[in-house]
Amino acid sequence: TTMTDILKPVFNSMRKGNVRYSKGGLNPTGASCVITDEMGNDKLIGKCHRAVWYSKTGVPRTNLPDDQTFIKFAVGHAMEDNFQTHWNRMGVLIEGNIPLREDISNGDPRGELIISGEVDGLLRDFEMNEEGEITRISSTKAIGMEMKTNRGFFAKKEVYGIGNKRYPTGHPKMDHVMQTALYLRMRWKLEEYYGVEIDSFRIVYCQVDDGLTTYFDISLSDGYSGEVIIKDRNGDRIQPDALASLEAGLDLKRIGGLTIENIMDRYYMMQDYLQDVENPPPRNYQLRYDEETFEKKLAAGEISKTGAANWEKKPLAQVGDWQCRYCDWKNHCLPYGVLTEKVEAGLLTEEAALGQLGIVGFGS
């Protein structure tokens, strides 16, 4: 007799997730924005419009996470619940997992713009002693909360600043910053309902493999609009380290253009793309960088030595944007991998592309 595999149904349940019903509208996780990076170049950050289009038009995902990834997700959820338990025990948690659905257009001539998401938590502001014992809880001020877990060497460097010359106190992930900025835009709903004033949100990070934690403070420059302001846990506005600029011989500036208005522009574009349910919008990222992008990224120090060597030596190496590499619709969008655009442009037949990729068709 075969032994009952008691784990298999767990993964099946994880894959299915909770019953998902669309609350309508676009989601904060789908945010994107064109910013000016530290070098002064325009740079797109956030979700690819085509990926959002696939999601909203119901195109089935072709590249689902594996079992290990589901375990990583589960660890993340467990950490969120754990932190909430402690904030609750200390008497400062107003509420956790608060659904928000709001028209954020605020009279924009382009019409309504419905965004729906879920805020991880809302805490009452408080005072405490050296030990962290709470001495006073505010009845009027509150802090919004986004919880994120991560793991691995790159997160340690980027988010926590370990061995990071450019940002020694770390830097939050831009996708998380934009998501949080949208909750700040919509926060009047929370303020009204809970009778509090919310000046900022915190993104709390927990590195599950090493137990590191940190947080960043996110606020808007002009009430519910304007520039998105990112501060580290010391309360200092984040900008590239002056010494790192000098050492690199670069004049590194604080990133610009990260505003509610610019984020909204991309959402309005997305809304227009969704009027056409037959034709997906253009790809925003590259599975393999073209020559021009490669040179730019190399100069900006955004490509590792290994990556650069692979790009130069291996014409099929997927040295490009992580947004394509880890996309849920990768095989649907790029059926011929890095050769897809050549096939689409008629420069390569499907058979030739498959041959180069080492996939031999039947009967040949």
Regions found by a protein language model. Name each.
Residues T1-G144, R151-K157:
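Metal-dependent nuclease catalytic cores that hydrolyze phosphodiester bonds in DNA/RNA
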Residues M147-G170:
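Short beta-strand-loop-alpha-helix junction that forms the active-site gateway
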Residues S116-E118, A142, V177, I198-S200, ...:
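Extracellular structured ligand-interaction cores
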Residues C48, Y183, C327:
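A residue-level signal for conserved active-site and pocket-lining positions in enzyme catalytic cores
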Residues I162-K189:
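Short, charged, amphipathic alpha-helix that recurs within catalytic cores of restriction-modification
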Residues K157, G170-M174, K189-S364:
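Metal-dependent nuclease catalytic regions and adjoining charged, substrate-binding loops involved
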Residues A78, N82, S116, D175-L182, ...:
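Short, well-structured alpha-helical interface segments that form or flank functional binding sites
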Residues R124-N129, R136-T140, R185-F201, D210:
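Secondary-structure boundary elements
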